Structure formats: C-alpha cells, structure tokens
Amino acid sequence: MSLERVLMGSALMLLLGNAHALEGRKIFAEGGSQPGAMPCIACHGADGAGMAAAGFPRLAGLPATYVRKQLEDFKSGSRTNPVMQPLANALTDAEIEAVSQVLAAMPAPVPQVVYRSEMPINAAQKLAQQGAWERQIPACASCHGPAGTGVGDAFPPLAGQPAAYLEAQLTAWQSGTRHNDPNDLMGHIA
C-alpha cells in the first residue's frame, strides 16, 4: 500500500467524520429529515443543558451509546414518553447515530466536588452519598459515580440533570411505566 493511498484514505475518513458531525449538529438544531422529527434544541436548549423549569433533561455530554439506546427504546416502545416517542420514531437510524455523537461531544457541566467524608446536609444528599440500607437502597454514587458523573455507558450522569426530570424518572421506575433496563435495577431501587 502506497503512502498516497494511506493519505487519501485518511483524508476521506476525516471528511466523512466531519460530515457526520455536521449532520448531527443540523438534526440537533433543525430537526431530522422526516416530518415530526423536531429539533432537539426546542426542548433541550441550545447547549443541550436541558430546561429545568420544564423538566427537560440535559443531554450534553451523555455517552453516545446511552443516548442511542434511549432513542432506540423510545422508538421501539420499551421506553414510553408522549413527547419523545413520536420524535424518536421520526428519526432514521443514521440520524439517531449522528445526533448521539454530537450530544456526547457537547460539554457537560462541571459537577460539584463531593467528598465521601462530608456529612450529608439533607435526605437527598444522604441517599446519593450513603443510600438507605435499612430499605435496601444503595447510594446513587455506587452506580452513577462520585458526584453523579456517571459510570460507563450503562449508568448515566445524574449531575446537571433537573430535579424535576430526576423525580419524574424515579416515579416512572417506581410505577413501572419506565422499564427499559434489562435487569430492572432502577425499578427495584425506586
């Protein structure tokens, strides 16, 4: 293989990757190619930080595989939401992949540093840092990481998510209306 072919192949891959990112940014800002594929920016904000007052979650900085799974779950019906299901159904698989990559590349908020040695000042902090073992509830940090920064692709960051969104998700896990976790970990915890 000649150096010229290697350089041409590398340049082509760079251009394709850049085109993929541009498509993802377009979907985020303007919507997908199908009717009903509204722009993400409408609910999740220009920076992907969500809209706390309306309970729309932060998407910026979430792992691409996590975002892709959630959109695919909305599309298949294994995760239900009257707003997100029709939007996800209107996205093609390529659009889901592109927007997932763009969201993952957006900067996430810097979480507040929490030291395990600090005593929680309220019930929510106690649950997050220490859990409620008397009710067999592990600390949120056990799966979602210190300061809620997330662990891998399976345990998303909680830091920076609006409280109303987190409360709605816990309620959905508790009632069984959210069940897109193969092991139902959160269903048991909630």
Language model regions located:
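Electrostatic cytochrome c docking/interface patches
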Residues: 17-36, 47, 55, 105-134
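The feature marks the first
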Residues: 22-25, 29-30, 36-76
